[in-house]
Amino acid sequence: MRNWILLYFIVPAVLFAVSGCGGNPSSSAGTPVTSASPAPSPTPSGSPTNATVLSNVEDSPKWLTCGACGNSGGTGSVANFSFTIGMPAPSEDGQSTQFAISPSVAFTNAYFYRQQTAIPQQINSLAYAFDLYIPVGMEKAPQAIEFECQQVLDGWVYNFSWQADYPLSEWRIFDYGLKRWDATPLNFTHFTPGTWHHVVAEYHNDTTAHTVIHDALTIDGVRFPVNITHNAFFSGGGNQFTNAVQLDSNSTATPYDISVDQMTITYK
């Protein structure tokens, strides 16, 4: 498959981000939240004034991967995985990117990331938006689908991660400092196959308090405020900014793929 990449090394800052992530149930933390999702709020329109906008991020051939780094603890068996850019179908604008995993061992995962230009200051608003498509017949295959942006600034890691957990049917966020996934009040309604779904994750950080704030998650035009804060983690690494997608395999190591289109990162 075109543009298949498998790396056994990775810059330290990104490795910090994915160590401990993954779909293995043992990586879960705390008691699942069973309360109903909070009431939705109106979805903001347009980009913030003076914002930087990175468009069609998925179309680049510069996606990187990193072997077993997406597994729990960042170790273990390496799944077969791939990405393919320029897919004419399914697509919304004539070309999408397909991310695929074909594991031979249960609970192995595939992490795909892109290095962007480092952001040398506090992020007052960050929106990671994309459209996602799951083929008919693969809708029960994922253990989880994850996506994130991450800033490393002056040695501090600000990790903005979401996980759609299929067995628990809940949205979770990653606590980078404690290396665990935490439940949120948001119920996860599994993505309907054979159609596009619009996802927007909103974040910001506080570089004085060294905290990460998950502001809201929007699914198919319905915005849910979250307002959950985690501590950043000091790694001592150089300034970086990355975005990522991860596919987690289930207990039967079922292969699957997703397509992503119109991926945009907006920040100021």
Predicted regions span which residues?
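Extracellular beta-strand elements of beta-rich domains used
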Residues: 57, 199, 261-265
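Short, aromatic/His-centered strand-loop micro-motif at the edge of beta-sheets
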Residues: 176-198
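Bacterial N-terminal signal peptides
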Residues: 8-17
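Carbohydrate-binding surfaces in secreted/extracellular proteins
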Residues: 130, 198-228
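Flexible glycan-contacting loops in extracellular carbohydrate-active proteins
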Residues: 227-261
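Bacterial Sec-dependent N-terminal signal peptides
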Residues: 16-49
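Secretory/extracellular carbohydrate-interaction modules
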Residues: 95-173, 267
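Extracellular glycan-recognition surfaces and repeat-rich motifs
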Residues: 61-99
